[in-house]
A protein has these predicted regions:
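Conserved AMP-binding/adenylate-forming core of the ANL superfamily
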Residues: 26, 43-96, 100-103, 120-125, ...
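Conserved pre-ATP/AMP-binding loop-to-beta segment of ANL
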Residues: 27, 42-45, 165-166, 171-172, ...
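Conserved AMP-binding A3 loop
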Residues: 61-65, 219-243
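Structural core segment of the AMP-binding/adenylate-forming
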Residues: 80, 111-196, 626-631
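Conserved AMP-binding/adenylation subdomain of ANL enzymes
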Residues: 107, 242-259, 269-313, 328
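AMP-binding/adenylate-forming catalytic core of the ANL superfamily
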Residues: 119-129, 136-141, 308, 315, ...
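Adenylate-forming
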Residues: 138-152, 170-171, 289-293, 308-355, ...
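Conserved AMP-binding/adenylate-forming
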Residues: 289, 340-344, 348-367, 371-464, ...
Length: 632
């Protein structure tokens, strides 16, 4: 595979696009992609897998030939269990080599449905039903994880399953530990199949189904959203995923000497594509850095040792990971192998980029993507000007525009350069709509443009700037406040590790800005000090937070992105508790996400006389909130 020319500006992207994607000899499926890589790079290492995320342990090494053989065996095992091409195999697994076998073998046999193990059991069951799942693959009972307990509690609710298959991490342990653990645990639950035993009996050189996979066949479902109710399922075709791998390879110029560290979960498109299919497409090596990835403190503490030992050339993370790595000394470590680090999922504060690069000498490249676009959409050019705070230039073959909509969400026109509007996507990696048809209202603009719901602008040079998420905007008396400007200012305080700004309800203004702060380990700063800092550094007077609340740890999603819905619920709770306790001291407030109402406040109220109860209801009526009163 010829090396890609370094992308400096938009003209280089346009030069690549002079060769249509259809003329780039793309594989017809992810299975054919892995087959080609096995033919070209058979004995090269595809995966180096760690069980503990430690630099001291010896990895399990898997060649491209072995990877393709295990993927083929997995596809055949699923076929023997009765899985058809239109049916799904769901997985609830940490980052293990078998997870890759299930993903790519599942796509060869049917459709893979990736499920976040941290979801509530009810949401997991809904995703299994919605995806037409017939086989479920999860973790065998194992110390330190409750995955099996979650699945065991759901078995009776899922009679449509043909089989439940378990991956046993004990099989990866040395013989004495393996046998001791299995003896202590006893036999697997009745009716449950062992993954490694199941695939061992299947051929590794052909698909027994004889299936001819077409580029437009659905390969996978990835869930997205779901702060209330069931997450949305985004189908990806084989063409979507192969095109994404090709585009990422062109953009990053992955080659056989690259080593990509994977710390993000394999139920998320970033882990699967950036540190999975894209490097596999080009014969690179993936370091699977432990089952829990970045959630494992050992991986964070050993991160720079791992970079040095494995000669890691790039990795992908989110801002919270970079903030954590800043606390780990890298002095004396040979980091010369690193070409760049990618940051996505949330805007990375400019000050955090500056601190990280000053400490490590490493170039941080911000990008942007989303599940509905298979993964990546834009990236700062690796060979050109990197504009801190920008999510860079669109990736090759990915179309991006900003649309101006009216108050009802109707398309008015395309935005002028630097004019803020809704960011819209089109191209070979964009999905065709959510599996649940009722989720597809108002997501398309014009001729096949997907409305991301993100607000942004594109400057004269093609650089894209996010200005906020439409639902993240703080609306103070009709004035839109971008939370990012507050967060950027707070990150400049030396004690701040993470900052997140949201709106708190206000009877007069609708919302007022507030901020949550997680301090750096060992650092100290009072809320008063941080408020004073904000008043001096937040550039817009109306955006200066009215309150700053210190918290021990920022709520995050499974991939480490700050989970603002939890902060909004907490802000509502704080306001209602403060206000209602002026009427009665022992009122308790609980605010929850509700599928019908969005946010619902439950107030547990002692016996009140008629006057105080009327005063409480008048107070609550001043907020645009749904609430319930409960007598205690």
């Amino acid at each position: 595979m010829n090396p890609s020319p370094s992308i400096v500006g938009l003209s280089d992207i346009e030069a690549l696009e002079r060769v249509p994607l259809e003329q780039r000899d793309l594989p017809s499926s992810t299975y054919e992609l892995l087959q080609r890589s096995a033919q070209r790079h058979g004995q090269r290492i595809a995966l180096s897998c760690l069980l503990h995320g430690s630099a001291a342990e010896e990895p399990l090494r898997i060649s491209y030939a072995e990877l393709f053989a295990r993927v083929t065996q997995t596809a055949n095992a699923l076929h023997r269990l009765g899985l058809e091409s239109h049916q799904a195999v769901s997985f609830l697994l940490p980052n293990l080599p078998q997870t890759h076998y299930v993903i790519w073998g599942g796509e060869a046999a049917g459709i893979v449905n990736a499920i976040n193990p941290l979801l509530e059991p009810e949401q997991i069951a809904e995703l299994i039903r919605a995806s037409n799942t017939r086989v479920l693959v999860t973790l065998a009972p194992f110390p330190g994880t409750d995955l099996w307990q979650k699945v065991a509690g759901l078995r009776a609710q899922l009679p449509e399953l043909y089989a439940i298959v378990v991956v046993d991490p004990a099989n990866l342990l040395p013989a004495p530990q393996r046998e001791a653990l299995k003896a202590q645990r006893g036999p697997l639950p009745e009716g449950v199949l062992d993954f490694d035993t199941l695939i061992a009996d299947c051929p590794a050189d052909r698909l027994e189904s004889g299936r001819a996979i077409h580029p437009d066949d659905v390969a996978s479902y990835f869930h997205t959203g779901g702060t209330t109710g069931t997450p949305k399922l985004a189908p990806h075709s084989h063409f979507n995923e192969v095109a994404m791998a090709e585009i990422m390879g062109l953009n990053a110029d992955y080659g056989v000497d690259d080593v990509l560290l994977c710390g993000l979960p394999l139920f998320h498109v970033n882990g699967v594509m950036v540190t999975g299919l894209a490097p596999f497409h080009r014969g690179a090596q993936v370091l699977l850095a432990g089952p829990q990835g970045y959630r494992n403190p050992t991986l964070i503490q050993d991160f720079w040792k791992l970079v040095e030992r494995y000669r890691v050339t790039s990795f992908s993370g989110v801002p919270t990971i970079y903030a954590a790595l800043l606390q780990v000394p890298s002095d004396g470590r040979d980091l010369s192998s690193l070409r760049f680090a990618l940051c996505g999922a949330a805007p990375m504060p400019v000050e955090l980029i500056r601190q990280f690069e000053a400490r490590t000498g490493l170039k941080v490249i911000e990008g942007y993507g989303l599940t509905e676009g298979t993964c990546g959409t834009s990236c700062n050019p690796r060979g050109g000007e990197r504009r801190p705070g920008s999510i860079g230039l669109r990736l090759p073959y990915c179309q991006v525009k900003v649309a101006v909509l009216d108050g009802e969400g109707n398309y008015l026109r395309d935005a002028a350069p630097n004019e803020v509007g809704n960011l819209c996507l089109k191209g070979p990696t964009v999905f065709k709509g959510y599996l649940q048809q009722d989720r597809n209202r108002d997501i398309w603009i014009g001729d096949g443009w997907f409305n991301t719901g993100d607000l942004g602008r594109i400057d004269e040079d093609g650089y894209i700037w996010l200005t906020g998420r439409s639902k993240d905007l703080i609306i103070r008396g009709g004035h839109n406040i971008d939370p990012q400007m507050i967060e950027e200012a707070l990150h400049r305080h030396p004690a701040v590790a993470l900052a997140a700004a949201v709106g708190k309800p206000d009877a007069k203004a609708g919302e007022l800005p507030v901020a949550y702060i997680q301090l750096k380990p060992g650092a100290s700063a009072s809320e008063e000090e941080l408020l004073e800092h904000a008043s001096r550094h937040v550039p817009e007077r109306a955006a200066v937070p009215k309150d700053i609340w210190l918290i021990e740890s920022m709520p995050v999603t499974a991939v480490g992105k700050t989970f603002k819905p939890a902060l909004r619920l907490d802000a509502i709770r704080r306001v209602l508790e403060e206000e209602s306790r002026r009427i009665a001291e022992d009122i308790r407030v609980e605010v929850v996400a509700d599928e019908r109402h969005g946010q619902l406040a439950h107030l547990h109220v002692p016996a009140l006389d008629e006057r105080r109860r009327a005063a409480l209801e008048e107070l609550l009526g001043g907020y645009a909130l749904n609430y319930r009163l409960h007598a205690v």
